[in-house]
């Protein structure tokens, strides 16, 4: 279940996010491909919203798409994100935003692997990461 909704003023967001995070998360920017640390992350764990900490993606659904952004074929739960039509830059895309704080995460495309066929293409700067051993959910 999604966590309680968070609402902050843009000034409050500016005070808690880095300039790059603010640009991507709050102004719907896009980081340069292959520039984010989490693109290269191979550790087991949970990817969270960098703005509010809501759990979004499991490392079990991360895959190498070759696009330069972390890619996942599914979300932890469908109530963790909201999808919006995005027709900016003369393209038809589906924007992915955090359902808890409304921050821009990236886009979802229909060219991903099985079992969903989806590719959640997410800005690395939009994400936090908690290693599996830190979550207390280690597999036996």
From Swiss-Prot:
Alphabetized UniProt keyword annotations: Metal-binding, Oxidoreductase, Zinc
Keyword Oxidoreductase: yes
GO molecular function terms listed in the Swiss-Prot or TrEMBL record: peptide-methionine (R)-S-oxide reductase activity; zinc ion binding
Keyword Signal: no
Active-site residues per Swiss-Prot or TrEMBL entry: 121 (nucleophile)
InterPro entries the UniProt entry points to: Met_Sox_Rdtase_MsrB, Met_Sox_Rdtase_MsrB_dom, Mss4-like_sf
PROSITE patterns from the UniProt entry: MSRB (PS51790)
Cofactor annotation comment: Binds 1 zinc ion per subunit. The zinc ion is important for the structural integrity of the protein.
Domain MsrB: start-end pairs: 10-132
Record: residues binding Zn(2+): 49, 52, 98, 101
Catalytic activity: L-methionyl-[protein] + [thioredoxin]-disulfide + H2O = L-methionyl-(R)-S-oxide-[protein] + [thioredoxin]-dithiol
Superkingdom as given in the UniProt entry: Archaea
Biological processes annotated in GO: protein repair; response to oxidative stress
EC assignment: 1.8.4.12
One Gene Ontology cellular component annotation held by this UniProt entry: cytoplasm
Cofactor requirements of the protein: Zn(2+)
Record-annotated membrane-spanning stretches: none
PANTHER family: METHIONINE SULFOXIDE REDUCTASE, METHIONINE-R-SULFOXIDE REDUCTASE B1
NCBIfam families reported in the protein's UniProt record: peptide-methionine (R)-S-oxide reductase MsrB
Similarity field: Belongs to the MsrB Met sulfoxide reductase family.
Protein name as annotated: Peptide methionine sulfoxide reductase MsrB
Gene of this entry: msrB
């Amino acid at each position: 279940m999604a966590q309680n909704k968070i609402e902050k003023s843009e000034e409050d967001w500016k005070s808690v996010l880095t300039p790059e995070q603010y640009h991507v998360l709050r102004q719907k920017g896009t980081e340069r491909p292959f520039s984010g640390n989490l693109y290269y992350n191979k550790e087991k764990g949970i990817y969270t919203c960098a703005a509010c900490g809501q759990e979004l993606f499991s490392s079990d659904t991360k895959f190498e798409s070759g696009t330069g952004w972390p890619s996942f074929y599914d979300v932890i739960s469908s109530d963790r994100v909201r999808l919006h039509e995005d027709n900016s830059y003369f393209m038809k895309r589906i924007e992915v935003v955090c359902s808890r704080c409304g921050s821009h995460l990236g886009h979802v495309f229909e060219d991903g692997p099985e079992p969903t066929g989806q590719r959640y293409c997410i800005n690395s700067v939009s994400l936090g990461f908690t290693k599996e051993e830190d979550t207390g959910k280690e597999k036996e």
